Regions:
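Low-complexity, glycine- and small/polar-enriched segments
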Residues: 1-221
Length: 221
């Protein structure tokens, strides 16, 4: 922007939040076969990002920032924060009950995300305190159960959990590309004057949690 900002406080916040109960994303698939010769297979896939086509997938981008070449004068706090927090739980179950049965269960969940917070531009900053923080805390769970109850039994399963994340907090630089997480402008020299005891906090934190659970069972005659 090109206008001078004079305010008591400033908050810039961008977030993806989990619901108070349950998962943000979930998917389930169940297959069963009870014929004399039974074959059943189930597959569940979930992609969390900007494109559902994995071959052409792009990051989910959550971004909070200020880009100003003019002065920013705030009596109190300047808080700029970006947070990604979601859960994804998918389940694939295949059960086969024929005398000669084969079943496979495939469960795959992937996430690509960027959490970015920045204070850019060349304008001076005067504030009581300054906080620029980016964080991410996704949790992915993939579950697969495959079973067969025939005399000649075969069953297989696959679980895949994958997170590709970038978390960045910057002062003096701004992001320049939605497709390249490493593409940021050259840093500007900024004059920052902080008058309060809270000072300046610049933080980037990421906690990626993944779990895969698989069970295969078969029974004889």
């Amino acid at each position: 922007g090109h206008g001078t900002l004079d305010a008591g406080a400033m908050l810039v916040d961008a977030k993806v939040s989990s619901p108070t109960s349950g998962d943000t994303f979930n998917a389930d698939a169940t297959g069963s076969a009870g014929a004399l010769i039974g074959v059943t297979a189930t597959q569940t896939e979930l992609f969390v990002g900007n494109e559902s086509t994995v071959s052409n997938s792009r990051d989910m981008i959550v971004r909070a920032g200020v880009d100003s070449n003019q002065s920013i004068d705030v009596d109190g706090a300047i808080d700029i924060g970006s947070n990604v927090n979601f859960t994804a739980d998918i389940d694939s179950s295949a059960y086969a009950g024929g005398l000669v049965a084969a079943g496979a269960a495939i469960s795959r969940v992937r996430a690509q995300l960027r959490s970015e917070a920045y204070l850019g531009g060349s304008g001076s900053v005067n504030a009581g305190s300054l906080s620029v923080g980016a964080s991410s805390d996704p949790k992915l769970v993939a579950r697969a159960t495959a079973g067969s109850g025939g005399v000649f039994a075969g069953a297989g399963l696959e679980t895949l959990t994958e997170i590709n994340s970038s978390v960045r907090a910057m002062v003096g630089s701004v992001p320049t590309s939605d497709s390249d997480a490493s593409s940021w402008s050259s840093a500007n020299n900024k004059s920052i004057n902080i008058t309060g005891i809270e000072g300046v906090t610049i933080s980037a934190n990421s906690s990626n949690r993944v779990n895969g659970y698989g069970e295969v069972f078969s029974g004889g005659a």
